[in-house]
Amino acid sequence: MNDKIEFIKLAWDSCIDGINSFCKGGDLKNKIPEEYSEKIFNKIIEKYSEPHRYWHNIDHLYKLIEGTLEKEFFECDYQHSKHFIMKVVLAIFYHDYVYEPEKSNNEEKSVKEMSNDFYEYLSNTFLSDVKEAILNTKNLVTKPEDGIVKYILSKLDTDIIYSSDMNELLYWENCIFKEYQIYSYSKYRDGRIKFLTKAYIETKNRKLLELVEFVNNRKPRVGLYVGSFNPFHVGHNNILKQADKLFDKVIIGVGINPDKGRKNEDYKKYLPEYREIVEYSSLVTELIKKLEEDYDVTIIRGLRNASDLEYEKNYISTLKDLTNEVKYVMILSDVEFHHVSSSMIRGLMKFTDSWKQYVIGGYK
């Protein structure tokens, strides 16, 4: 990963140096300072490194930048070619700057960030070309006559839908599935098939039809991490991260006491972001039965110590009494989290703010 970031940094520095050197007159309002450029680059890398990104991440950024080196994009003699190359590179850096899978205005938010970062340095005309290219990535297909900056960014960004390598397409599918894991599989499947069908109509790539069949028939392996999570804390998150390596997806099942309920809804803000969260107030076996309409479900139980092990063995034995088909896995938290518990945190809440070190706000 470090090699990729070094390559990406080289491309960024070359872009900024190019803008400072070649964008004379109207396009360059003020020279971009080196320290400011460094600050913006670090901010961009931080965004593309967000944990909920599996496809729209550093690797994706690297691949697009690498793609600008391909000869095919520069065979035509475009006037002021250096200017449009710099626009393409700047558009690449910002095209997925904001990526919130459940939102439909990521492109608009991304261009706003780009404009805020460069309005003091670049002309409205220069920024407008970059903005339009980023907003155009909402479309699957772009032609050269639509604008060369738009065309190159679109061609690089949608390269995967032209792939004839089924392994590559399956890797893409798994990454997108993880990015949209906030949704139930039935909802994800419907939206994904709609997108892939549209992509096939545009590209005539028959491999996409094979991918449609895969998505339609898939039954993802899911870990169901159940608990009261009142609140969800760093120890829970440690178990969750380990479980992510074992399953296609992990669903958080929040148990609600049907007699007491949850009068205080504050617990929700400590739950992880970009996850499918389900509340249940009946037997967990009923929840499993419902989820198994779409998923191959395995119960996840977290352990801190030997005392937890005895409790969990009894818990699993009870589940087996209720249904013989239950699958489960026990995951031991790392030693630095063995002392953390929700009851400890609730106790601290009464006297001090030190409890905040033990909870998370999504992935932050």
What are these regions (language model features)?
Residues 104-113, 185:
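Carbohydrate transferase catalytic cores enriched for Leloir-type hexosyltransferases
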Residues 110-143:
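Histidine- and acidic-residue-rich, metal-dependent catalytic cores
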Residues 213-364:
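Nucleotidyltransferase catalytic core that binds NTPs
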Residues 56, 60, 95, 106, ...:
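Histidine-centered active-site/metal-ligand motif
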Residues 1-32, 36, 40-47:
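Amphipathic alpha-helical dimerization/protein-protein interaction segment
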Residues 64, 84-101, 110, 130-138:
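His-Asp-centered metal-binding catalytic motifs of divalent-metal-dependent phosphohydrolases/nucleases
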Residues 2-18, 52-56, 67-82, 94, ...:
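Divalent metal-dependent phosphate-bond-processing catalytic cores, especially two-metal-ion Mg2+/Mn2+ enzymes
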Residues 38-67, 97-100:
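Active-site flanking loop/helix segments enriched in acidic
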